[in-house]
Amino acid sequence: MGLSDGEWQLVLNVWGKVEADLAGHGQEVLIRLFKGHPETLEKFDKFKHLKSEDEMKGSEDLKKHGNTVLTALGGILKKKGKHEAELKPLAQSHATKHKIPIKYLEFISEAIIQVLQSKHPGDFGADAQGAMKRALELFRNDIAAKYKELGFQG
């Protein structure tokens, strides 16, 4: 089920704060992901060697990838659920090339919520958190459907 116009507005309001520093937010999201779920680091050849949080914070490649991830996610969120065109190539690459399980998308969704809670507590109250969780769940469900079409059991 989709989000209401009001819920999308809550999502996009806080996303405006994220866009002020995509690379910084993205880096923090990836660090939380890798610290909370170290197994996810194995999917990233560029980052496998980063063992400590300090090493991760010092990595320009990690910062760049964080920017890439959140730029793509922002483009999807702005479509308010009508994200078929944006989702298809993302699902294709994540299923066939990177082989990223849906579970890992759940993990990064959790990390996104945590980063938004810590960086924007005034703009990310219970209603906004609920809306963002639903938006990310919609994204994951749609990616999972694409994975299935592609024959990937992620």
Curated annotation (Swiss-Prot):
Please list the GO biological process terms of this entry.
Answer: removal of superoxide radicals
Q: Name one Pfam family in it.
A: Globin
**KW Acyltransferase (keyword) present:** no
Protein keywords: Cytoplasm, Heme, Iron, Metal-binding, Muscle protein, Oxidoreductase, Oxygen transport, Phosphoprotein, Transport
Catalysed reaction(s) here are:
Fe(III)-heme b-[protein] + nitric oxide + H2O = Fe(II)-heme b-[protein] + nitrite + 2 H(+); H2O2 + AH2 = A + 2 H2O
Q: Which residues carry this modification: Phosphothreonine?
A: 68
Q: Which domain of life is it from?
A: Eukaryota
- Quote a single Gene Ontology cellular component term: sarcoplasm
Q: Which PROSITE patterns has this protein been placed in?
A: GLOBIN
The family assignment reads:
Belongs to the globin family.
Q: Which PANTHER family match?
A: MYOGLOBIN (PTHR47132:SF1)
The entry's protein name is Myoglobin
